[in-house]
């Protein structure tokens, strides 16, 4: 569907004709009569048009049967999609409306009104929502006053729809009649509950003309959803003053204020976990617009004093965050007034709290003799937050919450004993650098960095009631009051061995001390080196390498995984040949956080640039970062955790759960060739590759057979790559005509590849680990559970392509007038397995292996439980047009509503005619 056109093309033609009479006075004045240029302004008209075609399923509106293979349309998408280029990803962070615009203005006016003062004005993309202004007034060498204003939009999606309406800032209501009917269906018997998917999606008996389609509200809830474009607008203003009191002393100050206002998507769960069902007592969830309305304020006052051999500076910085919406309330679409533990009628979310931060900055530098220089900075900080707590819950069915003082109070009231957090943190950043030149061509640098993050927030007792499943157990926030201290010591030597050539070698140590984290202390040692050679003018060569090894003293699970028998913490570092015991609660004892666990890092970068002749320049670069977390010991297991080992192993040995490898590399090449003084060509190519490998374990309560067995370990890898091609040409004719054109393609792919590592059958030891419903006739210690909906299977590939063609023509009509014409074409092709199949309702599906079991929702799920490969039933009715084997929906989403957030593909044309006026 094409966006609506206007008469802007005619405006472009008229604008071009108005430029023609200027040739009558195109002669330039003699050079001696030319005044100095004070600035320039570029203004004109533009027009953009195109198609948003990336969601053909939405363009057709809802399917009348719920099966896109039997009737065109999508499942649960609401009314037909109305594509507008202005709300698409094409204008995600900009405002390119058609018509008149001012691209930029830059002007400096000295000796204002015969005085010694000056004024400077600058703008970028003036007038519309994507704009920037800077004004400066001052006296050279004496003082300067600046005013700056910036504005930028952010459009999140143009495919969203909802029936939520905002009745007050941050308060969202859902139509009463629909809530009542959904509650009635969920409160009925199993047959009544089974009609919820059809009622939501408008299929089966609830399809137009169906037996239950008595009115609009009965013919599919999501089919009545209204379009809603979540977006925010950011506005920021700055005032700064700088004054040189003496040639050596400068005083300065700044005030910055930023506001953000609008809406963005957020998900709410009206339950204690994401699991849900059709019953009124089961959980439910909904995506709603998050109301954004807050200010950031920054104040800075400081001064600098400097002499020839030393200098000092100091400043005070204050940061203040003010949120105009301190909480958000949303009605539960699936529960009108059936108040019960575990089934709330409203959801409550605490928004970002108001907070303040204060910093003092001190810095100085001095020469310690002729060959030594010392630089230092000390920056203490104080962070405060004391926002009032919200009530434990809005659910009146929960009573008797502990308030931290041993008594009981209503759960719908805020904590009585501790009404607010009294959040208190203190930071200290110190940097010391000593540089010396012991010999003519040698430089030695020693640096010490110290950072303290002390969380002094008092420990309070609370009674969490997340999900309103029951009256919670009193607990405290002690484990969340994390603190850390980081110290770095670096020694570096530089040798300038030849003209424009140097070599560097060094060592760095980093000590980390943490509180209320899994690792209390760790040490990372690094060695590095680099070489930079430009001795021969045509050749430039740069290379660097860094090796780092981080080791924790001891890995203690802060979540406290406990033994099923003794209740003691389960260690991961058991003796060789001993299997870690099963656990009852907390994390798997060998799970590791990547920012704390042992790691080996290798990093290398290189650059070569060669100019064999004046007309030709060739360049190439490459870089790689490899993080290896799969270390034996050092807080990890001393023996492989694989269930299958030796010749039967399905993967290499692993000693932890979590990320094992994180690898990224890039390379590229470029060439610039001057065909003549007027024409030059350029071409560039770059490739980026990212790869992460992790291993996890599927867990169920240990009361179930095989609940904690390495036979249910699974592996996931996430290869991603991006390729960028660019070719173009620059043409300059007689210093009058400038023509630039280029084509660029950015292509990216992302995959998530998963597989199980155990065995569904008889293992090499002769034990029957096969999956059987009810756990009959199989071994509890190795029962295979990765079947059906929990099978480890590959996700569909996500793909992104961005083509852009540009041509810019510029002509020097006179010394002051430069007409410019610009054309751009952009095509964005995109599909993401997380968003492209997304609609407002994803619960209209039939059960595993039983197409049609839900009336009007004949969408097949994964095949029955005896499958361990994660295969889908074939054919797949109701699949996404982007992913023929990808099922749109899940039976567990029967009581979930979504906004349908996506950013569809588009192609857009852009033309503009502008005039640069230099004055």
Name every feature range the model reports, one short phrase each:
Residues 94-102, 125-127, 229-233, 291-295, ...:
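Short sequence motifs at beta-strands and strand-loop junctions characteristic
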Residues 39, 101-105, 131-133, 143, ...:
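Hydrophobic, lipid-facing positions within transmembrane beta-strands of outer-membrane proteins
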Residues 113-120, 141-145, 248-251, 261, ...:
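Repeated loop/turn-to-beta-strand initiation elements of outer-membrane beta-barrel proteins
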Residues 24-113:
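Outer-membrane beta-barrel initiation region
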Residues 60-85, 159-221, 264-287, 324-351, ...:
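Solvent-exposed loop segments that connect transmembrane elements
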Residues 48, 93, 858-860, 866-871, ...:
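Outer-membrane beta-barrel "beta-signal"
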Residues 42-46, 120-124, 136, 146-150, ...:
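Transmembrane beta-strands of outer-membrane beta-barrel proteins
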Residues 45-51, 123-129, 139-141, 149-155, ...:
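Transmembrane beta-strands of outer-membrane beta-barrel pores
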């Amino acid at each position: 569907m094409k966006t609506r056109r206007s008469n802007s093309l005619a405006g472009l033609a008229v604008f071009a004709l108005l430029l023609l009479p200027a040739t009558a006075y195109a002669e330039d004045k003699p050079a001696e009569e030319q005044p100095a240029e004070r600035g320039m302004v570029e203004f004109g008209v533009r027009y953009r048009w195109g198609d948003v075609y990336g969601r053909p399923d939405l363009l057709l509106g809802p399917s009348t049967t719920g099966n896109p293979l039997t009737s065109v349309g999508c499942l649960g998408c609401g009314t037909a999609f109305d594509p507008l280029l202005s709300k698409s990803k094409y204008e995600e962070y900009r405002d390119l409306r058609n018509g008149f615009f001012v691209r930029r203005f830059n002007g400096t006016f000295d000796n204002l009104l015969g005085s010694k003062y000056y004024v400077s004005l600058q703008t970028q993309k003036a007038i519309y929502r994507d704009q920037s202004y800077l004004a400066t007034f001052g006296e050279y060498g004496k003082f300067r006053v600046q005013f700056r204003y910036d504005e930028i939009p952010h459009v999140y999606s143009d495919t969203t729809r909802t029936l939520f309406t905002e009745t007050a800032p941050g308060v969202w209501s859902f139509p009463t009649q629909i809530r009542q009917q959904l509650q009635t269906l969920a409160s009925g018997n199993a047959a009544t509950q089974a009609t919820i998917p059809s009622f939501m999606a408008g299929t089966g008996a609830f399809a137009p003309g169906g037996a239950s389609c008595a009115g609009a509200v009965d013919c599919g809830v999501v089919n009545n959803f209204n379009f809603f474009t979540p977006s925010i607008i950011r506005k920021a203003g700055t005032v700064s003053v700088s004054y040189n009191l003496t040639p050596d002393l400068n005083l300065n100050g700044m005030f910055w204020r930023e506001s953000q206002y609008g809406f963005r998507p957020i998900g709410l769960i009206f339950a204690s976990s994401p699991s849900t069902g059709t019953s009124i007592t089961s959980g439910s969830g909904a995506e709603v617009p998050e109301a954004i309305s807050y200010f950031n304020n920054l104040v800075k006052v400081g001064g600098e004093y400097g002499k020839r051999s030393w200098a000092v500076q100091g400043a005070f910085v204050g940061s203040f965050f003010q949120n105009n919406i301190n909480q958000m309330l949303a009605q539960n679409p699936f529960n009108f007034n059936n108040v019960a533990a575990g089934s709330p009628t409203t959801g409550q979310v605490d928004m970002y709290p108001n907070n303040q931060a204060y910093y003092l900055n001190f810095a100085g530098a001095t020469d310690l003799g002729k060959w030594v220089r010392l630089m230092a900075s000390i920056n203490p900080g104080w962070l405060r937050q004391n926002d009032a707590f919200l009530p434990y819950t809005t659910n009146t069915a929960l009573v008797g919450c502990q308030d931290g003082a041993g008594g009981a109070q209503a759960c719908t009231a805020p904590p009585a004993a501790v009404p607010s957090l009294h959040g208190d943190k203190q930071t200290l950043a110190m940097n010391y650098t000593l540089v010396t030149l012991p010999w003519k061509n040698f430089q030695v640098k020693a640096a010490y960095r110290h950072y303290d993050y002390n969380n002094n927030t008092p420990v309070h007792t609370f009674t969490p009631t997340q999900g309103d499943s029951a009256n919670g157990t009193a607990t405290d926030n002690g484990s969340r009051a994390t603190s850390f201290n980081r110290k770095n010591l670096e020694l570096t030597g530089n040798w300038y061995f030849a003209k424009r050539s140097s070599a560097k070698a060094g060592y760095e140590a980093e000590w980390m001390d943490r509180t209320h984290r899994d690792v209390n202390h760790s040490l990372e040692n690094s060695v590095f080196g680099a070489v930079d050679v430009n001795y021969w003018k045509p050749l430039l060569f740069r290379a660097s390498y860094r090796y780092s090894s981080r080791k924790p003293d001891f890995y203690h699970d802060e979540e406290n995984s406990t033994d099923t028998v003794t209740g003691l913490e389960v260690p991961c570092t058991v003796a060789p040949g001993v299997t870690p015991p099963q656990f009852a609660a907390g994390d798997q004892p060998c799970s590791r956080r990547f920012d704390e666990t042992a790691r080996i890092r290798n990093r290398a970068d290189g650059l070569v640039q060669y100019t064999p002749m004046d007309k030709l320049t060739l360049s190439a670069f490459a870089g790689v970062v490899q993080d290896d977390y799969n270390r034996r010991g050092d807080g990890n297991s001393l023996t492989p955790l694989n269930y299958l080992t030796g010749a039967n192993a399905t993967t290499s040995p692993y000693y932890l759960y979590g990320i094992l490898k994180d690898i990224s590399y890039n390379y590229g090449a470029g060439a610039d060739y001057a065909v003549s003084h007027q024409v030059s060509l350029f071409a560039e190519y770059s490739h980026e590759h990212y790869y992460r490998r992790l291993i996890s374990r599927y867990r169920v309560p240990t009361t179930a057979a095989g609940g904690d067995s390495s036979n249910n370990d699974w592996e996931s890898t996430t290869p991603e790559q991006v390729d960028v091609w660019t070719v173009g040409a620059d043409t300059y004719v007689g210093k009058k005509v400038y023509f630039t054109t280029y084509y660029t393609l950015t292509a990216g792919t992302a995959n998530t590849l998963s597989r199980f590592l155990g065995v569904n059958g008889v293992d090499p030891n002769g034990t029957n680990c096969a999956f059987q419903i009810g756990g009959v006739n199989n071994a509890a210690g190795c029962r295979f559970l990765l079947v059906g909906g929990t099978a480890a299977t590959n996700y569909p590939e996500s793909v992104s392509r961005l083509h852009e063609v540009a041509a810019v023509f510029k002509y020097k009509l006179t010394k002051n007038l430069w007409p410019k014409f610009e054309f751009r074409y952009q095509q964005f092709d995109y599909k993401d397995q997380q968003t492209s199949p997304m609609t407002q309702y994803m619960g209209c599906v039939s059960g595993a292996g039983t197409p049609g079991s839900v009336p009007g929702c004949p969408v097949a799920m994964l095949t029955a439980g005896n499958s361990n490969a994660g295969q889908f039933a074939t054919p797949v009715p109701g699949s996404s047009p982007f992913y023929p084997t990808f099922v749109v929906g899940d039976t567990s989403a029967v009581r979930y509503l979504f906004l349908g957030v996506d950013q569809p593909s588009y192609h857009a044309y852009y033309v503009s005619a502008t005039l640069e006026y230099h004055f």
